[in-house]
């Protein structure tokens, strides 16, 4: 009997805050899951079981270990959310993507800006809540940011098949923001706040962005799904089956890794186990390695 592609592991909550200069980043892990590598990377060959990326916490029993969540970012004057997980009470073909406990370390009305790195189902779910009659913005004081290329693609006919496969998450998690007048379409290099800006990184999706923080001489980068799994550090040319434009995603990922490697920049990948941030270092044998923050 073939093993299931997805295995739910456990739910999560807010993790230990990380300081980047005067900015505090709190990862929020909504849940862990294990996924068949071939679902993400259909052309993937056998993995070296002794390689760092094939061992816990990145892999278990032949499965990739992946988290879903978000990041609360507190600057001296702002409280932002980078991505919004999968949400609660939303009908999805994959039962893992529903009924996920809400564990934000701040009150919903404290968040003034929600930045979407892209509009995939696992990055927008908590953007809205059901008020008994309709889906409404979940963070009442917030503006929500996306790019024109991103919004146009996911609301257009070209993405219809993807929406059908994963449930109409655009209808319950994105369009209500637009209807409420709180969804702002910004440039892919938009300055979000002092020391916080977007950087274009197309490929995984057409309007995909990364989020850069610079504070008191320190730098961090929210990679979204540019690095979905540690495998892509060892093999940067490897794109997932969920990338809209695989070659473009590879080019953006390679540029990102060149930019942050060996610089001390703290990387916040969206789906690494326990949302542990780290630094990217060049591997003399090829590709890159990941040093979780605190490892040195």
Language model region names:
Residues 30-31, 84-87, 119, 149-150, ...:
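Active-site metal-binding loops of divalent metal-dependent hydrolases
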Residues 14-103, 210-224, 229:
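Conserved beta-strand hairpin/beta-sheet module of binuclear metal-dependent hydrolase folds
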Residues 217-296:
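Cap/insert and terminal regions of metallo-dependent hydrolase folds
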Residues 80-82, 115, 144, 220-222, ...:
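Residue-level marker for buried hydrophobic side chains located in beta-strands
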Residues 3, 95, 102-106, 110-124, ...:
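Metallo-beta-lactamase
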